Amino acid sequence: MQAIHNDKSLLSPFSELNTDNRTKREESGSTFKEQKGGEFSKLLKQSINELNNTQEQSDKALADMATGQIKDLHQAAIAIGKAETSMKLMLEVRNKAISAYKELLRTQI
């Protein structure tokens, strides 16, 4: 038994798990998290801008329908349906984000 405890060659595969390597991984992980946080923010802003554009197209289609300037009624209906679906999706994303935030607040440390 003592030979096993004193033989450091048996521990060589585990020597890579020392604190220096762990610190490097943690540092790179924090950088990764910061980058991903920025990416999420960009994605969210992009999605909101796309939703806004879709809503504007829908409003224009409705105005054109009301004034009789629209030539293709089907395209207007598609634009309105697309805007409605996009809004529902964004509301669900918002609801899930709020739910996740509330769950984090309830988490005890």
From Swiss-Prot:
Keywords: Bacterial flagellum. Residues 1-38 are annotated as: Disordered. Coiled coil: none annotated. The gene is fliE. GO terms for cellular component: bacterial-type flagellum basal body. This is Flagellar hook-basal body complex protein FliE. It is found in: Bacterial flagellum basal body. It comes from the Bacteria. PANTHER family: FLAGELLAR HOOK-BASAL BODY COMPLEX PROTEIN FLIE, PTHR34653. Pfam families: FliE. One of its GO terms (biological process) is bacterial-type flagellum-dependent cell motility. Residues 19-38 have a biased composition (Basic and acidic residues). Belongs to the FliE family. One of its GO terms (molecular function) is structural molecule activity.
